[in-house]
Amino acid sequence: MSVLKKPDLTDPVLLEKLAQNMGHNYYGEPAWPNDLLYTFPVVILGTLACVVGLAVLDPAMVGEPANPFATPLEILPEWYLYPAFQILRVVPNKLLGILLQTAIPLGLMLVPFIENINKFQNPFRRPIAMAVFLFGTLVTLWMGVAATLPIDKFFTLGLF
């Protein structure tokens, strides 16, 4: 037989907390099973219904339709592959381009070992990791934009 501690309902501190609904959600129901089994599926299915409904009723054109009788001047990959495409396009040796793309994740795996700081610390107090992140983001965006331009405008992005 388990022994449960009964709350002292004459304690003024406890009565003040109960008056402010502390320890309970606003409508007084527990999160399990009510929220997790009933509310979340309704929200998820409602969101899914909205997305599917919009996709069926108002489809967005992703680009111009393909013409099997005309080859485009320059064939580009999908937008998320632009930086990798730009590396292969700029580096003269294709093997060197593949090795460069392999070296990027390997270099990122070394960053935590370079900076010997508590992993639970604020990310803004890790200057090396923040510098690597910001530099990598800028270079990736730069290469992604440059992949859509001619090769002679790669470094300046056509601005100068």
Swiss-Prot record:
Topology within the bilayer? Multi-pass membrane protein
Bilayer-spanning residue ranges: 36-56, 95-115, 127-147
Q: What is its main location?
A: membrane
Show the InterPro entries listed in the entry.
Cyt_b/b6_C, Cyt_b/b6_C_sf, Cyt_b6/f_cplx_suIV, Cytochrome_b_C_euk/bac
Q: Which Pfam families match?
A: Cytochrom_B_C (PF00032)
> Keyword tRNA processing on this protein?
no
Annotated GO MF terms: electron transporter, transferring electrons within cytochrome b6/f complex of photosystem II activity; electron transporter, transferring electrons within the cyclic electron transport pathway of photosynthesis activity; oxidoreductase activity
**Record-level GO BP terms:** photosynthetic electron transport chain
**What role is this protein assigned?**
Component of the cytochrome b6-f complex, which mediates electron transfer between photosystem II (PSII) and photosystem I (PSI), cyclic electron flow around PSI, and state transitions.
- Which NCBIfam families does the entry mention? cytb6_f_IV (TIGR01156)
Assembly mode? The 4 large subunits of the cytochrome b6-f complex are cytochrome b6, subunit IV (17 kDa polypeptide, PetD), cytochrome f and the Rieske protein, while the 4 small subunits are PetG, PetL, PetM and PetN. The complex functions as a dimer.
Q: What is this protein called?
A: Cytochrome b6-f complex subunit 4
Q: What gene makes this protein?
A: petD
